[in-house]
Amino acid sequence: MNPTSIVLIVIATVAVCLIIMQIYYIYENYDNIKEFNSTHSTLEYSKTINVFSLDRRIYDPNDHIYDVKQKWRCVNYKNNYVSVSVFGFKSNKDKNIKMFTTINDCINYTFSKSTHSDIYNPCILDDGFQNQDCIFLKSVI
């Protein structure tokens, strides 16, 4: 065997290995590929997706917080879901607690990068620790 044939055999072997790896990755992610295609099939011929999709692998407000009590989470409160942390509840501008009917709505609101909401902490008000909202907040933290 001359050096040229050895180089060609090595290149062919590497190419076959890469093809096998690609087939394996497609096999592993086939369900995700089908889900993505079904979600965006109506936009097949458009230039951009133009659909709000939230990828929490890229942005998570809890990524840079190391104290567990400060991390935002969604919990069940009065048959609805609310975003809580040690700082308080996520709220509307008029200091009403923002409530969601489903946990997915709460998660999408809490972990959306575009959401800049107010925070309402009922424990720093005049009635303070006697407030039902404050008692609940302390119980989940």
Curated annotation (Swiss-Prot):
Membrane topology of this protein: Single-pass type II membrane protein
Entry's localization field: Virion membrane
One GO term describing the cellular component: membrane
Reported modifications of this chain: Contains two intramolecular disulfide bonds. They are created by the viral disulfide bond formation pathway, a poxvirus-specific pathway that operates on the cytoplasmic side of the MV membranes.
InterPro entries in UniProt: Poxvirus_A28 (IPR007664)
Residue numbers on the Virion surface membrane side: 22-141
Superkingdom in the source lineage: Viruses
Gene Ontology process terms (BP): membrane fusion involved in viral entry into host cell; symbiont entry into host cell
Keywords: Disulfide bond, Fusion of virus membrane with host membrane, Late protein, Membrane, Signal-anchor, Transmembrane, Transmembrane helix, Viral envelope protein, Viral penetration into host cytoplasm, Virion, Virus entry into host cell
Keyword Transmembrane helix: yes
Membrane spanning stretches: 1-21
One Pfam short name: Pox_A28
Function summary: Envelope protein required for virus entry into host cell and for cell-cell fusion (syncytium formation).
Family: Belongs to the poxviridae A28 protein family.
Protein name: Envelope protein A28 homolog
Upper lineage: Viruses, Varidnaviria, Bamfordvirae, Nucleocytoviricota, Pokkesviricetes
